Structures are given as C-alpha cells and as structure tokens.
Amino acid sequence: RGIKVVIGTLLMVGKGNSLLGAMQSLDYMGMMVFSMVASRKKWFYNGSGGNLAFTKDVYFDYLESAHDRDIVSGDDVFLIEFVSSKFDKSVLFPRNQEIIAYTQPEPDFVSFLNQRKRWANKSFSYRNNNILAFWAFLWIVNVSFIIALILAIINGGLFIKVFAAALFGKLIVDYFMLMPMGKFFRRPINKFILADFYHILYVVLIGFLAFFNKSFVWKERKFSR
C-alpha cells in the first residue's frame, strides 16, 4: 500500500568464462546488494530500468518535473530518486528470487569502459548526497589500496605487511558479502580473487575518467557532461 516503484534485482550473466565478464558479474551483484541494503536503511535508492515497475501517475509526475533535464542517460535512477524524495515509503526493493532479471555484460573492455564512464558521469547529477558520499567513499578506499601498493613497492618492510593485511581484509569482506548473495541469486562467484584485484583498478580508473574525461560513447554517439 502506497508503493509507487518496485525495484527488482538485475544480474549480469555472460557467455563464456572471461575475467572481464566475471568481474562485471561480481561488480553488478555487489551494486545490487549495496542498493538493496541502502533502500532498507532508507539511505538512498538505486536500481535499473532493466527490472523496474512503477505506477503510471508517478511516471507522468516525473516527466512534468524535468528532474533529469539535459542528462543523457539515467532516467531510471532519476525516476527512483524523484519518487523517493516526493513520496515517503513509496519505493520497494524486495529480496525476492521470483523477480530477478538478467542482462549481458559488455563484450570488451572499451564498451565496458564507456558504460561505466556514462554511469559515473550521471552520478554528478544526483540530488541525494548519501549516494554521492557512498560512491566517493568506495572510490577513496580503492585509491588507498593503490597508494599502499606504491608505498610497499618503494619502501618495502612494514608497508608490505600493511598492504597485504589490508588487501586480505578486503578480500574477506567482499567474499563474505558476495558468497551468501551468490547462493541466494543462484549465481557462482567465479574468479573471485582475480576479479577483486581487477575491480580495484577499474574503480580508481573510472573515478579519474569521470573527473577529467567527461566524454563517453553510447549507442554509437559521443556525449559529454
């Protein structure tokens, strides 16, 4: 009662067994987990148009609001943001196996990079400071791993131990977050360790590109923030 938007889980399921595909699959599963937890805690709401239901009246309200005017993509996210800010307790993100949808990961690194740049660029238009703070925190954490690695290579000794301990801690936290959700979603967490290393590099890279390279390619057209 009073629900105007229902967010369903969307998972990436790729063909083959590539490291890039495994990393995208785990990354997207992680985003779904964080988004589900955040919605239950009322921190922020996030979802994908690939598995989203909403009432007709709230959709027309959203169109009239021009909430995402002049933003190239992300109407699904901005619709959720608009509804959650206007109507209290109106967005639901249930943990339900019966409303899971599936999508394909990007086939190559260039396509993947452009997709993530597009997502990162639209985040600058979010009006909810909680979600901005969350993504900024994740980026800073991953940057700290790169800095720690550089210090370990240059100085050795204690820095190597600190880096190894921090990295081991990250792997443990990520594994115990993804493993139960992988079982719930009936998705394996293949190549977890390699994908987790890859994930650190990609998060840092995308963050820098979002700040300093504001252009991206989408549907064979080039856009700029």
PLM-predicted stretches and their roles:
Residues 21-36, 118, 122-125, 192-195, ...:
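Short hydrophobic helices that act as membrane-entry/anchoring signals
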